[in-house]
From Swiss-Prot:
<dbReference type="InterPro" id="IPR027471">
    <property type="entry name" value="YbeD-like_sf"/>
</dbReference>
<protein>
    <recommendedName>
        <fullName>UPF0250 protein Sputw3181_1029</fullName>
    </recommendedName>
</protein>
<dbReference type="Pfam" id="PF04359">
    <property type="entry name" value="DUF493"/>
</dbReference>
<dbReference type="GO" id="GO:0005829">
    <property type="term" value="C:cytosol"/>
</dbReference>
<comment type="similarity">
    <text>Belongs to the UPF0250 family.</text>
</comment>
<dbReference type="InterPro" id="IPR007454">
    <property type="entry name" value="UPF0250_YbeD-like"/>
</dbReference>
């Protein structure tokens, strides 16, 4: 697992924003939502912005997380999506 201090800094459960940056592909948003649904089922409305040249998408999604481990799992799973460059 990751070595984070989320448990010291946050009160759970809480809404937590994830920003996923990846190659511009029409299915990227659907892949992000699918991973989030697997770990935190809910009704999500992510926002997607294209980079200035259109090469990358930035997807922001707010997820209700229940623990430090929950956040770390989501970071790991989102980073494993094909085409994802960064998870912030």
């Amino acid at each position: 697992m990751l070595d984070t201090k989320f448990d010291e800094l946050m009160d759970f459960p809480c809404a937590f924003p994830f920003k996923v940056v990846g190659d511009a592909h029409e299915a990227l948003t659907d892949r992000v939502v699918a991973v989030v649904q697997k770990h935190a089922p809910g009704d999500y409305a992510p926002t997607t912005k294209a980079s200035s040249k259109g090469s990358y998408y930035s997807i922001t999604i707010r997820v209700t997380v229940t623990s430090k481990d929950h956040i770390e799992t989501l970071y790991t799973e989102l980073a494993a999506i094909e085409g994802v460059r960064r998870v912030l």
